[in-house]
């Protein structure tokens, strides 16, 4: 039986790739031989008993949305409710959309992507639990794009969210359970 046949039926624990002699390895430089011999003689690493802790700094930030539920605070065509948003939406709707993307922590290039306004509107509706459907959002964005951006901006301005920072005391001793 050849080498493959005799080693094929052995237990995987008995067979290590580092213990196999290969004729291809005989043409290696002395530096490579030294590296391979060190690997063959290397003792397996011990198990990790201490795992890294997420948020090792001890600080956690929690955003609490105070007002949720219901419908949109203003209608789609209620642009005159907030003059700043009205003028920004009229003269530079992309700037207003960049402001909304910044509010969500997205890149300022976000409004250049197709469907970004639709995603921002759905994100606002889902985050604040505003009643509505995807079909209504799609129609508002694709038929009344500038009005839709203004409505989302007004909603984000009217709905409040508070940011809390919680400090945790780090554990001093790790124990195995």
Swiss-Prot record:
Coiled-coil segments on the chain, per record: none
UniProt xrefs under InterPro entries: PLAC_motif_containing (IPR006461)
Protein origin, superkingdom: Eukaryota
Membrane-spanning residues: none
Leader peptide range in chain numbering: none
Similarity section: Belongs to the cornifelin family.
PANTHER family: DUF614 FAMILY PROTEIN-RELATED
This protein's name: PLAC8-like protein 1
Organism per entry: Homo sapiens
């Amino acid at each position: 039986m050849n080498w493959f046949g005799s080693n094929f039926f052995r237990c995987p624990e008995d067979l290590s790739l580092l213990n196999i002699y290969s004729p291809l390895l005989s043409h290696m430089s002395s530096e490579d031989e030294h590296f391979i011999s060190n690997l063959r003689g290397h003792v397996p690493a011990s198990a990790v008993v201490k795992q890294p802790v997420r948020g090792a700094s001890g600080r956690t930030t929690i955003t609490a949305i105070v007002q949720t539920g219901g419908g949109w605070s203003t209608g789609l065509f209620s642009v005159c409710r907030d003059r700043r948003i009205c003028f920004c939406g009229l003269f530079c709707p992309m700037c207003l959309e960049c402001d909304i993307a910044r509010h969500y922590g997205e890149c300022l290039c976000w409004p250049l992507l197709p469907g970004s306004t639709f995603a921002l509107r759905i994100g606002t509706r889902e985050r604040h639990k505003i009643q509505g459907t995807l079909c209504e959002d799609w129609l508002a964005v694709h038929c009344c794009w500038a009005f839709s951006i203004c409505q989302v901006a007004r909603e984000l301005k009217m709905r409040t969210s508070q940011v809390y920072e919680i400090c945790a005391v780090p554990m001093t001793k790790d124990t195995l359970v």
